[in-house]
């Protein structure tokens, strides 16, 4: 049986003499054509594919000794199967059933007693153990066959691995040599460059496909060996299990029949013996009683005969004697009856004790009989379950056989594909050799272009700053709000709208003229740019974007919107398309593109308002009491030229979407109130401070700047707003800070060295000290209303903007760390 199982196992295992020898011949033929690898590396050619320093990860994936987490080696699977079968084949040992203690096992303990009592040996245990030993021996033989096959597969996989390593190192050798020179750049350079990229990508794909095919081949071999080993082990296990169950079943039937027969025989013998003993005892008692009665009767008769002849003589004396004897007779009879009843009672007690003893002896036999019946039922259920398992194993085995056949066909197709791929790799190697000179020159030219690009970026920053200085470090843009149908429109003209719009004309009634139309006067104002009502925020930001670039180059930039309430300042600065979100989006996009040139930027945002000369953090969390405990004060670092505010919330800006959240949070916390000019008038100056920190890892350059985007409160005069109470106090504080802003700008434009600049006259100018002076670039938006009723305030705003536009401040300096 063992020899036949071994032959069937070895016949079902995959034979590698043909397929693996063919793989070895293909590997030897291919590796003989690959020269020894000589790797050349070039630190500047970062885009050229380099050989992998270690193939340990791929080797570990290809080694058949390491199995997937969900698949056991055939040996281990066979051992598990055999051990489980052995456990099922040893039902007479206490260890096979963990729920039953060794001393109380029904079969192991009582089979011996039954055999000793009835003279019948229990031989099924040794036969079942021999069957399990046969299963284990077949499992060991299947493992030896599988280990031989595994060593052959491992050698084939190592050959394939060495072949792949040689291909990669040869390709790396050729790729490292491909460094073209700029003097020999051919006309079709771009075509070859694209072709090389395609070849590199194709080679990488084929390499991954080869690795996957090798891994699939190894897994297929393992699964096939496992399936065959499991099939043989399952067959042998099922056969031994069936033999064991049949023997156990027949033995149990024989034992049950024997026990029932012996039990009936014992019961019958005990009953007969008991009846015989009772009959003997009763007959003995009766004989003794009869003998005693006869003795007494004989004595009485003899006495009567002895004294009868004296009765007549001694009548009186005999009567007395007769009465005495009669009493003695009665007492003797009473004693005899009492002795007989006591003897009967003793016999009955002895009978009861014997009956109880027999019943106690019968009860274990009945319990043993019931236990044997339960064991038979359990064995029948196990036999049924094992039959189901057998059927499942048969179906699984058929499925595994079909899968093995599919894998064999797939393996053959993969071997042909590998051969084709090897030929393609050889062809690609020749093509790479042809393109070696082109790649070498292209790489050198690329390095030169990178250096040139870095130099041009530095030059661009200088030229950009020069252009901005020529335009003026303080500039003024005028923007007219589009009419919203809320009143009569004023006469506003844009004479040079078709060219670089820089002039705005307003027709209004001159002061002191009559209402008949006499004294109409035309007012003209010139600024750096003038935007008509049709201009969108995107168009405005296109003009503004150059200053945002200056902020990224390391210059402090201050942009603020000035104008009366309702002139469109908040829409210009804080709407979804306003200057604040557009500026942040531009910085993000620009910083992403500058990463190729070595620049990295970090951004932090702060949002505050100045209300009645008090700084309020618009991003602070908590209730009003907690916010009031934080004291916000302005500190200036003279050496670094930097302004900081204590206890203010600073939010790192990692995405442009965070700016939208900042604007929403600030809008909820900003102070607004209804006035005569606007139902929702901003009663404070809002300041968005964006701190930029840039560094270039290639050149070692660093820059730091602050971008201030300010939405000033309404600039209408007290005579126009007619504010009272709390609104009056707010208007006075707003006008004071705006007046101080004009004084600072005027002092900066005086040009006299040592001139006192009144920064500390207001919180606004004190905060913007390093963003308004010669170390910065300033842009003022003057927003005006298109309504006729607002013309006086419009003229006042335009005159203030003209003063600012006529101011010249010093040259801005770049802030470095």
From Swiss-Prot:
Keyword RNA-binding belongs to the record: no
Gene Ontology MF, one: minus-end-directed microtubule motor activity
Biased composition (Low complexity): 8-23, 76-86, 122-132
Segments forming a coiled coil: 155-242
SUPFAM superfamilies reported in the protein's UniProt record: P-loop containing nucleoside triphosphate hydrolases
Catalytic reaction(s) noted: ATP + H2O = ADP + phosphate + H(+); ATP + H2O + a kinesin associated with a microtubule at position (n) = ADP + phosphate + a kinesin associated with a microtubule at position (n-1, toward the minus end)
EC number: 5.6.1.4
Name of this chain's protein: Kinesin-like protein 2
Annotated source species: Schizosaccharomyces pombe (strain 972 / ATCC 24843)
Gene assigned in the entry: klp2
